[in-house]
């Protein structure tokens, strides 16, 4: 079974890769897409975490980045429900996932 710590570390690895993608795009299109996705999700099933993301996504990129990479429990919780799906390719996601498979027992 995979530990919560490993799940949190894997989530941080995904977030780090997402940040790298977003920073490579000066227009930050992925942030705009995440805002739209978050709005759709809020209409379907509002939650405190989506409300937090909705608020956060209206802030400057550096604040969003800081939250994505935040090592606190708040950061872990936000990463578990982040609206940046689709930023990483399937290959990138699997590479990260496989890197953490050795931590499963």
Range-by-range predicted roles:
Residues 66-105:
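Short, compact, well-ordered microdomains
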Residues 3-56:
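The feature represents the first ordered module of a protein
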Residues 28, 47, 62-63, 74-75, ...:
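A general structural signal for well-ordered secondary-structure junctions
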Residues 53, 59-67:
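Mid-chain, well-packed structural core segment of small domains
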Residues 31, 35, 49-50, 61, ...:
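Alpha-helix initiation and N-capping motif
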Residues 42-43, 61, 98:
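Non-transmembrane "mature" sequence context
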């Amino acid at each position: 079974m995979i530990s919560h710590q490993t799940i949190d570390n894997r989530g941080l690895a995904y977030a780090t890769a997402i940040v790298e993608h977003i920073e490579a795009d000066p227009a930050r299109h992925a942030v705009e897409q995440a805002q739209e996705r978050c709005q759709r999700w809020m209409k379907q099933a509002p939650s405190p975490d989506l409300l937090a993301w909705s608020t956060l996504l209206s802030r400057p990129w550096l604040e969003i980045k800081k939250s994505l990479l935040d090592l606190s429990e708040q950061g872990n919780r936000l990463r578990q429900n982040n609206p940046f799906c689709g930023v990483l390719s399937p290959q990138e996601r699997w590479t990260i996932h496989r890197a953490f498979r050795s931590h499963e027992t």
